[in-house]
Amino acid sequence: MKIKQAIDKIPGGLMLVPLFLGAFCNTFTPGAGKFLGSFSNGLITGTIPILAVWFFCMGASIELKATGSMLKKSGVLVVTKLATAWVVAMIAGAFLPGDGIQNGLLAGISVLALVAAMDMTNGGLYAALMNQYGSKEEAGAFVLMSLESGPLMTMVILGASGIATFEPQLFVGAVLPFLIGFTLGNLDPDLRKLFGNSVQTLIPFFAFALGNTINLSVILQTGFAGIFLGVLVIIVTGIPLILADKFIGGGNGTAGIAASSSAGAAVATPLLIANMAPEFAPVAQQATALVATSVIVTSVLVPIITALWAKRFSPKHA
């Protein structure tokens, strides 16, 4: 059976298929983890430890060596995306209630959902698109995008906007596995290869555990809001990214469009933030479902828009 091949045909499938399987299990057999115990319970409830290993391996996979132009392009896109998410957090924090929108088609939208969906780029999607529609240097710019992975930047944005307060040790705890992996990976290429190969392997495991924190009814209830959030991510982050790419990064805007997506890893952010800041616990489940939908929407729309933009503004694709 070509199971992996079928999963790869689904946008973000490696993350989303196990996520929905986990949600299915949690909806219809919510006590399975406690009933089975032992290793099975670890797989079902082990989101945090599995993610800790994934962050370590992600850090180990990043090679420090990069050209100046590559770092410039990557830095421009990362800073622009994070700055945009911060502005959104400031505006949303002033108008949205702390527990998010409770009624109507946009029920479930919260500051946490908005920031989590907007502050992290799908680096794999970006690299694939720029390999096709950009230059090798532009494709290689995804190197710094890996630094967005995990809850650290979301914590910084929520803290800087005054929406949440985190103890200093929580920032250290959030980034330490990544930094240790990054250090080891750059000290020894063999370790980088060893741990780097595990990044993709671990995704289905933390996705399944994460899915076991979600009820399918929440996903159904937030369907329209999730689609709206995905489109909003492309518009709100895409426009500043295009402008930054053109006027600072020296590109034609294609890289900006390619970076205007929600990363699959962002689906885990609401739960991680709620784990450190309990005031977000009431909105974490809905935010997770919304970000998951946003990942699907942006994974489908961003390649289409990028292709159209490149055809219009890139000479070699005109």
UniProtKB/Swiss-Prot annotation:
It is found in: Cell inner membrane. Catalyzes the proton-dependent uptake of 2-keto-3-deoxygluconate (KDG) into the cell. GO terms for molecular function: 2-keto-3-deoxygluconate:proton symporter activity. This is 2-keto-3-deoxygluconate permease. It holds the Pfam family KdgT. Belongs to the KdgT transporter family. Coiled coil: none annotated. Signal peptide: none annotated. The chain crosses the membrane at residues 10-30, 42-62, 76-96, 105-125, 139-159, 162-182, 199-219, 224-244, 254-274, 289-309. GO terms for cellular component: plasma membrane. It catalyses: 2-dehydro-3-deoxy-D-gluconate(in) + H(+)(in) = 2-dehydro-3-deoxy-D-gluconate(out) + H(+)(out). It is a multi-pass membrane protein. Its main location: membrane. Keywords: Cell inner membrane, Cell membrane, Membrane, Sugar transport, Symport, Transmembrane, Transmembrane helix, Transport. It comes from Pectobacterium atrosepticum (strain SCRI 1043 / ATCC BAA-672).
